[in-house]
A protein has these predicted regions:
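A detector for small-residue-rich transmembrane helices and their helix-helix packing motifs
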Residues: 1-266
Length: 266
């Protein structure tokens, strides 16, 4: 374990403090994730400041532990080369960038649903209902298909279907819009990317894995895994994979910018 540097220590303490305050706030009914977590831009809970605050909020102790372990493990070595100001700047920028990319990807994923909603209410037909139902996992395909078939046969009237979905669509939007992303993972993945570039051949001795893996290979494999799970929409794990990739991407672009402007690693 590397010696804890000043910037990494400050970030570590800030994350722990917010976590403890969140536990205390729960007793008063204050939901820290609803106030500091990052929401989709069309959510009623969205605030621009959440692009910064979300990275200091964690979903639980293990979420906090693994992010802070990585912060200390990778961040201290990076800070010892870059210095505190540059290190903290990089951490915050990659965290914000990860949040921005997460929101962009979320918007792209929700566009088919939002377009299908508009199309359905503009021209409510059984086919438009099927398109609406298959545009989001909120609605079960089999149930929508059965509902559309009954509508076609006259079992339900146009007015009944429209009235039902006028009530269900706001609920579906709330479910899709009002799930916040929290955690320092985006910034941590930015640190991981920087570590792999700065110390490519240094072998990482990971928890639960007794074999050392060169940092450059670990970063590549981890990035590929995140891309795979993100593309496959592996939402069952409740992990914002594209936020992780966003932290790596923003970190890479920032380091590339520094290199081209005469600021090397050392």
């Amino acid at each position: 374990m590397p010696q804890l540097t000043n910037g990494a220590k400050a970030l570590l303490l800030a994350n722990i403090a917010v976590f403890l305050l969140g536990l205390l706030a729960e007793r008063t009914g204050f939901e820290i994730d609803k106030n500091l977590g990052l929401f989709y831009i069309k959510s009623e809970y969205f605030k621009p400041l959440q692009f910064i605050t979300y990275m200091f909020v964690h979903a639980g102790f293990m979420h906090l532990f693994f992010n802070m372990f990585a912060l200390v493990q990778f961040g201290s070595m990076i800070e010892s080369v870059w210095g505190t100001k540059r290190f903290v700047f990089y951490y915050l920028v990659t965290g914000v960038g990860a949040g921005v990319i997460h929101i962009i990807v979320t918007h792209l994923q929700l566009m088919p649903f939002l377009d299908a909603v508009d199309a359905f209410f503009a021209n409510p037909t059984p086919d438009a209902l099927v398109a609406l139902g298959t545009s989001t996992p909120v609605f079960k395909d089999a149930a929508i298909m059965e509902l559309a078939d009954r509508w076609r046969t006259g079992f339900y009237t146009d007015e009944q279907i429209i009235e039902a979905f006028e009530q269900q669509i706001p609920q579906a939007k709330a479910m899709l819009f009002n799930t916040p992303v929290v955690g320092a993972s985006g910034a941590v993945f930015g640190l991981l990317l920087a570590f792999g570039l700065m110390f490519p051949n240094l072998k990482l001795q990971l928890l639960f894995i007794p074999i050392g893996i060169p940092a450059k290979y670990f970063v590549i494999l981890y990035g590929i895994a995140e891309l795979f799970f993100g593309i496959k929409d592996f939402s069952g794990d409740n992990i914002a994979h594209f936020a992780h990739l966003g932290g790596m991407l923003v970190g890479f672009l920032l380091i590339l910018y520094w290199q081209r402007n005469g600021r090397r690693y050392e």
